[in-house]
Each structure stands twice: as structure tokens, then as C-alpha cells.
Design a protein with these regions (language model features):
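Metal-dependent phosphoesterase signature
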Residues: 2-30
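C-terminal cap/substrate-recognition subdomain and adjoining C-terminal extension
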Residues: 22-52, 56-171
């Protein structure tokens, strides 16, 4: 439906058009500085801090942001593209259920969004590349709640961010 609607409105569905949209994203105060500060803080304590995006948003838009390079991986919704580079069908659709699976993929070091074998193999917690107790999940929406609960229940930390200027954003 989204693709049909965009075509009717004459909007470009090319990967580069999505990335261009990402270049226009505005951030909460301090987001750009966060990465350098937290990476330096971790390095000073012998910790290799890794950042991931786990979003129900569009991956190609997120890849266009000026902070995309800070992330080891971006788990998000994405499209299939035709020979001219235009989106024609969803490749990955992300909801709160997928997002919890992506947390396990991060936990077990599985980079592929489509892998269902490695993520489901047993691996002792202490052998996992990113243990839950070392995770900090920062979320801003209702699809983040299950991930926040998962990370917190496994010994990690969860932080909810919201814009106080938006009516009802805290509820």
C-alpha cells in the first residue's frame, strides 16, 4: 500500500531518495556527541562499546543519516529493488516481535536479518559476544517496550526517551 501511494503521489522510491530523507532527520540534543563520549568512556575502562539500531523504521532512511556510520549494524524494515533501483516490494517488515529477535541476534553476534538458524542455536550466555547484562537499550516508542523488558529482565538496562513538547509522548 505504501509503495502504491508513493507512486500515485509521484514520490521517488529509489534507494538514494530514501537516503536523502535520512539526511534531513533532526536529533534530540546530544545525540551526535553521544557516540564519541560513550566510546571514549568505554575505552578508558577497556570496554569496546558497540552501537546498533533496532527499528521498525526504514533501513534505507536510517542509512542516510549522518550518524549511520556509528552503528555496527542497522536492523530495520527494508525493500527489494528493481533493476532501476526503485523499491517494488518489502524485503523485511519489522514489528515488536522481530525487534526482540534482533536483540537475540545482537546477543549472539548474528548480523543477518534473515538468519533463523544461528539465532536459535544454543550458546552459553558467557560465550555470547554481547551479553544481555552489558546491553543498554534506548527506546522511543511502543514497539520498543518488549525489547526494553527483555534486556532489563536479563540484567541489562533500558532507557525510554521522549519529546516532552509532544502531547502524550510520555504516556
Amino acid at each position: 500500500k505504501m509503495i502504491e501511494c508513493a507512486r500515485r503521489k509521484g514520490l521517488s522510491l529509489k534507494r538514494e531518495a530514501f537516503r536523502e530523507s535520512g539526511r534531513k532527520i533532526t536529533y534530540y540534543r546530544g545525540v551526535r556527541e553521544w557516540f564519541g563520549r560513550i566510546n571514549a568512556y568505554g575505552a578508558g575502562r577497556g570496554i569496546d562499546v558497540q552501537h546498533y539500531i533496532n527499528s521498525s523504521g526504514i533501513k534505507e532512511i536510517l542509512e542516510g543519516t549522518d550518524i549511520a556510520r556509528e552503528f555496527k549494524n542497522i536492523y530495520a524494515s527494508s525493500f527489494l529493488y528493481d533493476d532501476e533501483g526503485a523499491a517494488y516490494w518489502p524485503a523485511v517488515g519489522v514489528n515488536y516481535t522481530n525487534k526482540t529477535q534482533f536483540i537475540y541476534k545482537i546477543n549472539k553476534g548474528v548480523e543477518s536479518v534473515s538468519d533463523t538458524k544461528l539465532v536459535n542455536q544454543y550458546l552459553e550466555e558467557e560465550k555470547r559476544p554481547v551479553q544481555f547484562k552489558h546491553m543498554i537499550f534506548i527506546g522511543d516508542g511502543t514497539t520498543d517496550i518488549p525489547c526494553m523488558r527483555l534486556v532489563k529482565s536479563q540484567g541489562g538496562h533500558s532507557i525510554a526517551v521522549y519529546n516532552p513538547a509532544h502531547q502524550g509522548s510520555f504516556e
